[in-house]
């Protein structure tokens, strides 16, 4: 086919024409979305990423074009020339921006034919197996829903760049090939051909480089950065992800929080015309764990947790008493109107927490005649009213209680609280509840390795008033870290950084880095801190996760153009994949015979 014989440059897109253009001569190009034959006329819905336009092929007015249209099939690419005409009365489509007009086609050229697609591209409502969608991702993206999410992502990135530029931030790219440093997850490693036996690491974040930029005097930095983590995956994680990375000098956490809040407000308004109220709520890490059992609570509904150890200790219920003796935790929450839960429903929730490693779920209903449950007999009358008041129980309510180790109790109640909220439709998907979580512990205890580890990363500054606890009680030290949470998802985290070389050295030593390991992994950074480091702080926001929530998508893969599966594979290009033996020899790498094949 000689494509130069037909001028297929568009005069308009498929979402652009309105009734004001009636009688105009136009050229459109796109994909055949649907074809319909009606009484000799052929109707084609022509699609591009901008929208749909209806084409009309009339055998009397344009017999050649009509004859060619008889051959058209879904997903063929065509170009047409024609006249904009109004649709007949009663035939308009108010659901389409172009629904008042159609194009009477005079000329058509077929630019590209298509095999029959493995699934319908024209209908977003038809459920398609995700593996099939990912294998043919280039077809999946043509579906309107996926394309809209990618457009929203573009709008968000553009809004971020414009806003941060106006705030004096410089967009600076940092290296992709870097050094392997401990940041909490496994690194993706890249072998060096020039230096056999040595490896680069793909960045889990630009953390060290952005701090070096502050030492370099760049003052305010940002980057829409690709990051890589070889970690266990779930619906809101990918091995390759994008974050809005920021760092600034000579500021306070309050300054940075204000900038981030205004940035998010701008993104939501730009992308979805949503007005986000500011300032965001703030809760300490300790309050979050006490009232919600996690450090990323969903605040769109109630059901706060209550510590019941003091009341449980007054009962004769052995399950509670045994846990209290073992330094366990008895906690619960109240479900309004939950007294109508059937025994079957309660058993299902008991099984649910059982899968989280908790053996039982205690419950008490408040009815007109008082408290009702098989365990009420273990509760002395003297604490009934106290339980009712502390749990804010009204007639018709139910409370669920769990007794276990503090970590398991909190985890199970957090998951149960979220599940019940979903089951009872307590979550408004159109409501966005932001939260800053502050005052995290600086350290946590790694039971397996019997040592302290950083709760965030080792560059986070402690609260200066807690420095005296470094040697005596480091687990009580608070960090200057802050996470931002949206609807129960952590969408970002940051901190005030350590800008003093001696303090940074002490933190590394407290984390049990040997002098040799410290010099090998961080010697260059500790040296840089000795050359006049300004106070600085920063944050990284998860772009993929923000777009996932903004577009009300359950799966992060839906907002990434070419995502990996939950097994970190790409079904479309079939990777990871073997490489040629010659490449392995150059890298001096030996690999065992693989039993895996994509075929």
Curated annotation (Swiss-Prot):
NCBIfam families: aspS_bact, PRK00476.1. GO terms for biological process: aspartyl-tRNA aminoacylation. It catalyses: tRNA(Asx) + L-aspartate + ATP = L-aspartyl-tRNA(Asx) + AMP + diphosphate. Aspartyl-tRNA synthetase with relaxed tRNA specificity since it is able to aspartylate not only its cognate tRNA(Asp) but also tRNA(Asn). Reaction proceeds in two steps: L-aspartate is first activated by ATP to form Asp-AMP and then transferred to the acceptor end of tRNA(Asp/Asn). Homodimer. ATP binds at residues 229-231, 238, 490, 542-545. InterPro entries: Aa-tRNA-synt_II, aa-tRNA-synth_II, aa-tRNA-synth_II/BPL/LPL, Asp-tRNA-ligase_1, Asp-tRNA-ligase_1_N, Asp/Asn-tRNA-synth_IIb, AspRS_core, GAD-like_sf. Belongs to the class-II aminoacyl-tRNA synthetase family. Type 1 subfamily. GO terms for cellular component: cytoplasm. Its main location: cytoplasm. Keywords: Aminoacyl-tRNA synthetase, ATP-binding, Cytoplasm, Ligase, Nucleotide-binding, Protein biosynthesis. GO terms for molecular function: aspartate-tRNA ligase activity; aspartate-tRNA(Asn) ligase activity; ATP binding; nucleic acid binding. The lineage of its organism: Bacteria, Pseudomonadati, Chlamydiota, Chlamydiia, Parachlamydiales. The record marks 38, 90 as: Important for tRNA non-discrimination. This is Aspartate--tRNA(Asp/Asn) ligase. It comes from Protochlamydia amoebophila (strain UWE25). Pfam families: GAD, tRNA-synt_2, tRNA_anti-codon.
């Amino acid at each position: 086919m000689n494509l130069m014989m037909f001028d297929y440059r568009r005069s308009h897109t498929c979402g652009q024409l309105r009734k004001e253009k009636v009688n105009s001569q136009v050229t459109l190009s796109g994909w055949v979305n649907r074809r319909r034959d009606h009484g000799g006329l052929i109707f084609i819905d022509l699609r591009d990423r901008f929208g749909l336009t209806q084409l009309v092929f009339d055998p009397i007015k344009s017999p050649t074009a009509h004859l060619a249209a008889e051959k058209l099939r879904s997903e063929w690419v065509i170009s047409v020339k024609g006249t904009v005409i109004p649709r007949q009365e009663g035939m308009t489509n108010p659901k389409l921006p172009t629904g008042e007009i159609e194009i009477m086609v005079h000329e058509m050229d077929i630019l590209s034919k298509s095999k029959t697609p493995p699934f319908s591209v024209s209908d977003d409502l038809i459920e398609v197996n995700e593996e099939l969608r990912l294998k043919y991702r280039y077809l999946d993206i043509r579906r309107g829903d996926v394309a809209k999410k990618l457009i929203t992502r573009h709008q968000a990135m553009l809004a971020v760049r414009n806003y941060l530029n106006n705030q004096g931030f410089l967009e600076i790219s940092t290296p992709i090939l870097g050094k392997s440093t401990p940041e909490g997850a496994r690194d993706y490693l890249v072998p060096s051909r020039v230096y056999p036996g040595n490896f680069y690491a793909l960045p889990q974040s630009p953390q060290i480089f952005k701090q070096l930029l502050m030492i370099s005097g760049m003052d305010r930095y940002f980057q829409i950065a690709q990051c890589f983590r070889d970690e266990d995956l779930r619906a809101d994680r990918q091995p390759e992800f994008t974050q809005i990375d920021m760092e600034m000098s000579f500021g306070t956490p309050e300054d940075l929080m204000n900038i981030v809040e205004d940035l998010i407000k701008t993104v939501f308004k730009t992308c979805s015309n949503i007005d986000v109220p500011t300032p965001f709520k703030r809760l300490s890490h300790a309050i979050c764990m006490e009232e919600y059992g996690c450090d990323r609570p969903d605040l769109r509904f109630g059901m706060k947790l209550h510590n019941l150890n003091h009341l449980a200790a007054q009962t004769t219920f052995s399950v509670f008493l045994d846990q209290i003796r073992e330094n366990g935790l008895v906690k619960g929450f109240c479900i309004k109107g939950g007294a109508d839960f059937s025994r079957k429903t309660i058993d299902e929730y008991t099984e649910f927490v059982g899968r989280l490693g908790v053996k039982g779920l205690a419950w008490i209903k408040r009815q007109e005649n008082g408290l009702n449950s098989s365990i009420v007999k273990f509760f002395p009358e003297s604490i009934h009213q106290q339980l009712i008041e502390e749990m804010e129980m009204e007639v018709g309510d139910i409370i669920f209680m769990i007794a276990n180790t503090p970590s398991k109790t909190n985890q199970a109640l957090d998951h149960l609280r979220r599940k019940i909220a979903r089951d009872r439709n307590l979550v408004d998907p159109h409501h966005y509840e932001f939260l800053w979580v502050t005052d995290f512990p600086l350290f946590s205890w790694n039971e397996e390795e019997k040592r302290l580890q950083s709760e965030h990363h080792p560059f986070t500054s402690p609260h200066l008033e807690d420095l005296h606890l470094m040697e005596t009680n480091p687990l009580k030290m608070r960090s200057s870290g802050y996470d931002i949470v949206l609807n129960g998802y952590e969408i970002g985290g940051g901190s005030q950084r350590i800008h003093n070389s001696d303090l940074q050295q002490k933190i590394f030593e407290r984390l049990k880095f040997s002098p040799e390991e410290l010099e090998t992994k961080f010697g260059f950074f500790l040296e840089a801190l000795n050359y006049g480091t300004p106070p600085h702080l920063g944050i990284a926001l998860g772009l993929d996760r923000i777009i996932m929530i903004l577009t009300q998508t359950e799966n992060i893969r839906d907002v990434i153009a070419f995502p990996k599966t939950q097994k970190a594979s790409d079904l479309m290009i079939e990777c990871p994949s073997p490489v040629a033996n010659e490449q392995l020899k150059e890298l001096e790498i030996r690999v065992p015979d693989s039993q895996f094949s994509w075929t």
